[in-house]
Amino acid sequence: MEASGTDDVEKLKSKFLSAWHNMKYSWVLKTKTYFKRNSPVFLLGKCYHFKYEDSSVTSDGGSNSGSESKEDLSGNVDEFRKDFISRIWLTYREEFPQIETSSWTTDCGWGCTLRTGQMLLAQGLIVHFLGRDWTWTEALDIFSSESEFWTANTARKLTPSLETSFSENNECVSSNKQPLHNCDKKSNSEDFHQKIISWFADYPLAYFGLHQLVKLGKNSGKVAGDWYGPAVVSHLLRKAIEESSDPELQGITIYVAQDCTIYSADVYDLQCNKGTEKAVVILVPVRLGGERTNMEYFEFVKGILSLEFCIGIIGGKPKQSYYFVGFQDDSLIYMDPHYCQSFVDVSVKNFPLESFHCPSPKKMSFKKMDPSCTIGFYCRNAREFEKAAEELTKVLKSSTKQNYPLFTFVNGHAQDFDFVCTPVYDQNDLFTEDEKKRLKRFSTEEFVLL
């Protein structure tokens, strides 16, 4: 009886917490987001220009004519909007099956970094199976009338001219990344769209669902209700993909950089395992400063988000985790996991997809960013990894005034430098002793999540 009473109290607390988060964050979701004029907008390696060529438009974005048509802008605006909405949005959920050995039926208040990690991996899987150019056919249908920033008047503020700092190293062109499967047919691409979302479902058997990540976290001393930093989440995602049994997932793996170093030989070993070539998601936990983010690193962050290989950044600001997907000028564009939504049963045929897609982007100043974050990249094969390493090295060299970059590429294996990169794990232990020491250091520096 006593245990049952305790469970009832915990469930009541969960419901109250969910209601509080919805009250706190729902208004943020509905708040208008404005974009500045005369600047490009970058979204996961793509650059969008919304040029307004009518000479009657004044320098402040106004117009001397009241008869201008929206057609001048609507096409490009729709491209950006459709691209953003098509990214998978994973948020707090409530009333899902109880997490094993706990009374939790919601992750409100503690699961935001797990959610941002899920979103980054989901983007990697979208690129892997469907290609970077894929967009959801119904993306524009869920656009809310409350998001007035997409009106023609505001769109004029998006009139961009490529910044000089990017003109030498970046071209505003669509990514040529090809999908693993031929998804010319709508039915085929939508099947994979639903399948990818189902892998992140909130029930125990989902490969990358909250239940599985919490289960893996137990092996490193984490339990449901604890906060998880970006570095820890990186290793949980790696372990989750290692343990996945779906045949479709055997062609992709995850590499987590050790001490801000990517050992190329270890990446090649993962990609060319057992005679088959795999795609790799590379996760690099870094710090962009000490107590606060060093503003000198902003050019680095912009350079990273402008690369076609980038699948986003697990980061945030103190006490809140966000999934960063782009930028404009000095503001980062992100997806917010803090809005609490109801559990969706993905076992139902044609389950609703709307709640897995965010209708509106949000922006925040780079100076508010917490220094602790994890950067993600996707490389389909060894050749792409070589190209990514080359492009990343350019960004690292050009964006820092320090004598050393935020992370480096080193030829050879980690073990050649007395580090363990691909350890053999015991069933009851997620991390090796060396990794535990490094993660303990990371954990003491990472932000505390509400």
From Swiss-Prot:
Reactions this protein catalyses: [protein]-C-terminal L-amino acid-glycyl-phosphatidylethanolamide + H2O = [protein]-C-terminal L-amino acid-glycine + a 1,2-diacyl-sn-glycero-3-phosphoethanolamine
Broadest EC class assigned to this enzyme: hydrolase
Entry keyword set: Autophagy, Cytoplasm, Hydrolase, Protease, Protein transport, Thiol protease, Transport, Ubl conjugation pathway
UniProt entry tagged with the keyword Hydrolase: yes
Pfam families the record matches: Peptidase_C54
InterPro entries documented for this protein: Papain-like_cys_pep_sf, Peptidase_C54, Peptidase_C54_cat
GO cellular component assignments: cytoplasm
Taxonomic superkingdom: Eukaryota
EC number(s) reported in the record: 3.4.22.-
Any one GO MF annotation of this record: cysteine-type peptidase activity
Localization terms from the record: Cytoplasm
Active site: C112 (nucleophile), D336, H338
One of the GO BP terms on file: protein delipidation
Main function: Cysteine protease that plays a key role in autophagy by mediating both proteolytic activation and delipidation of ATG8 family proteins. The protease activity is required for proteolytic activation of ATG8 family proteins: cleaves the C-terminal amino acid of ATG8 proteins to reveal a C-terminal glycine. Exposure of the glycine at the C-terminus is essential for ATG8 proteins conjugation to phosphatidylethanolamine (PE) and insertion to membranes, which is necessary for autophagy. In addition to the protease activity, also mediates delipidation of ATG8 family proteins.
Protein family: Belongs to the peptidase C54 family.
PANTHER family with a match to the protein in the record: CYSTEINE PROTEASE ATG4, CYSTEINE PROTEASE ATG4C
Record protein name field: Cysteine protease ATG4C
Source organism: Xenopus tropicalis (Western clawed frog)
Name of the coding gene: atg4c
